[in-house]
From Swiss-Prot:
Its main location: membrane. This is Glypican-3. The modification Phosphoserine is found at S352. The keyword Membrane applies. The record marks R358, S359 as: Cleavage.
Length: 580
């Protein structure tokens, strides 16, 4: 509510700063025979009075404010009025989009940071699983897990990384360590040069079963949707920025000058433009911008459809926060088949004669330390899912933003709304009778100064980008009804699995399944017994990719909700500095 009030105040302040004619309310006085009032007003726009005649002149050199008699305007004054009118128009357009722009910028920043926090929590879960269940695999497992989740973060931010390659690299790296530390802990040092053979055997023999394929499918689907969601928000910002900084044509500038300032030349300082006339001028000036409307509407509706489908395997929270359990199940699968795998790999890699096989026993009670998964209780919890839905509802209130722009600008500039005793661009009339044109360039009212032509190149480019993102959003949107259920079952979710939107069964089949919160509470942190940054060996395992991701987005310590709130506040302050 406070943000809306601040935004409204800024809009009012901006509008009050514009140099519009007719801001006072008294009825129009008779024309000024000495040009004194014209000189006083013009001095606000241009210091000095050398361009303003002291008494009315013929004005034969004027090109916009064509006089029917003596005028108080010169050619230089007319040029200054045109420049001022175009600047006023640009400021009006920016004030119209301020609330929408702030909404998208704020949410894009918040969601990007929140998704990064989800990735860090998922990394913590996974490292905690290794520490509690397979301590002999650390710190090597920490390094591989760190590289994997770094790739996940980079992918979300738009990096050209293949998800299948990410997952394959994780399991390719883990298997040699599992083979030498869990399956054959007594393997002599002379046999440790078989890593490449083990990496190849991992895929050929499917030593982890179908778990890598399952992870590929789930991670790929959830990250693709998340990535498109962020891309769509960033494009929304680009669309608003593009239309915010449009430079209006000279034809438009002449029409604006005629509407807002030409009455001054006749000494009519208090006259307001007719409301209907304003609508005609604005529809003409913004005909190209209004062409965006169709694709903007589709953008919001497509984004809504995508958000409605972001759950289960299409929700990165659900997938990434449960990834540790699937990885654990995959390692258990290897252990259960250790004897067969050791024999086969021993022959394949030609080292079976040099080893004595000694199986490692891991009792069932060492599954997952539930203390690691404690969740801090927060009243009135807000999940990312609810925040996404809230964003969509707010965006839908702007679905007619572009088609409504001409009317918005006229309603926020001084006009005679009842079209009585108003300025029609040429003279003061008792009533304006010309009907306003319909939106769009093809149907606009025929005005001489506004030539019929297509949208500006920059508008055409942004329309093409909207078409592209709309196509991506439609492609990524979830199938509905039974098709959805069938797809989920095929990806490893069987009927009877936990399906609650807030709590999911994280863990594979068997007695080891536990129930944890699978959605982070918005702006709330999970309580961990294990801080990954303090994990043994982890502080020295920084990789080049870790450095790369820090250049994208430096989040600081994941366990500091104050930093998240501070960064959000900084984003808001920076936005308002940019506006001013």
């Amino acid at each position: 509510m406070a943000g809306t009030v601040r935004t409204a105040c800024l809009v009012v302040a901006m509008l009050l700063s514009l140099d519009f004619p007719g801001q006072a309310q008294p009825p129009p006085p008779p024309p000024d025979a000495t040009c004194h009032q014209v000189r006083s007003f013009f001095q606000r726009l241009q210091p000095g009075l050398k361009w303003v005649p002291e008494t009315p002149v013929p004005g034969s050199d004027l090109q916009v404010c064509l006089p029917k008699g003596p005028t108080c305007c010169s050619r230089k004054m007319e040029e200054k009025y045109q420049l001022t009118a175009r600047l006023n128009m640009e400021q009006l357009l920016q004030s119209a989009s301020m609330e929408l722009k702030f909404l998208i910028i704020q949410n894009a920043a918040v969601f990007q940071e929140a998704f990064e926090i989800v990735v860090r929590h998922a990394k913590n879960y996974t490292n905690a699983m290794f520490k509690n269940n397979y301590p002999s695999l650390t710190p090597q497992a920490f390094e591989f897990v760190g590289e994997f989740f770094t790739d996940v973060s980079l992918y979300i931010l738009g990096s050209d990384i293949n998800v299948d390659d990410m997952v394959n690299e994780l399991f390719d790296s883990l298997f040699p360590v599992i083979y030498t530390q869990l399956m054959n802990p007594g393997l002599p040092d002379s046999a440790l040069d078989i890593n490449e053979c083990l990496r190849g055997a991992r895929r050929d023999l499917k030593v982890f079963g179908n778990f890598p394929k399952l992870i590929m499918t789930q991670v790929s689907k959830s990250l693709q949707v998340t990535r498109i969601f962020l891309q769509a928000l960033n494009l929304g910002i680009e669309v608003i920025n593009t239309t915010d900084h449009l430079k209006f044509s000279k034809d438009c500038g002449r029409m604006l000058t005629r509407m807002w300032y030409c009455s001054y030349c006749q000494g009519l300082m208090m006259v307001k433009p007719c409301g209907g006339y304003c609508n005609v001028v604005m529809q003409g000036c913004m005909a190209g911008v209004v062409e965006i409307d169709k694709y903007w509407r589709e953008y919001i509706l497509s984004l809504e459809e995508l958000v409605n489908g972001m759950y289960r395997i299409y929700d990165m929270e659900n997938v990434l926060l449960g990834l540790f359990s699937t990885i654990h199940d995959s390692i258990q699968y290897v252990q259960k088949n250790a004897g067969k795998l050791t024999t086969t790999i021993g022959k394949l890699c030609a080292h079976s004669q040099q080893r004595q096989y000694r199986s490692a026993y891991y009792p069932e009670d060492l599954f997952i330390d539930k203390k690691v998964l404690k969740v801090a209780h927060v009243e009135h919890e807000e999940t990312l899912s609810s925040r996404r839905r809230e964003l969509i509802q707010k965006l839908k209130s702007f679905i007619s933003f572009y088609s409504a722009l001409p009317g918005y600008i006229c309603s926020h500039s001084p006009v005679a709304e009842n079209d009585t005793l108003c300025w029609n661009g040429q003279e003061l009339v008792e009533r304006y009778s010309q009907k306003a044109a319909r939106n769009g360039m093809k149907n606009q009212f025929n005005l001489h100064e506004l030539k019929m032509k297509g949208p500006e190149p920059v508008v055409s480019q942004i329309i093409d980008k909207l078409k592209h993102i709309n196509q991506l959003l439609r492609t990524m949107s979830m199938p509905k009804g039974r098709v959805l259920d069938k797809n989920l079952d095929e990806e490893g979710f069987e009927s009877g699995d936990c399906g609650d939107d807030e709590d999911e069964c994280i863990g594979g089949s068997g007695d080891g399944m536990i129930k944890v919160k699978n959605q982070l509470r918005f702006l709330a942190e999970l309580a961990y017994d294990l801080d990954v940054d303090d994990a043994p060996g982890n502080s020295q395992q920084a990789t080049p990719k870790d450095n790369e991701i820090s250049t994208f987005h430096n989040l600081g310590n994941v366990h500091s909700p104050l930093k998240l709130l501070t960064s959000m506040a900084i984003s808001v302050v920076c936005f308002f500095f940019l506006v001013h």
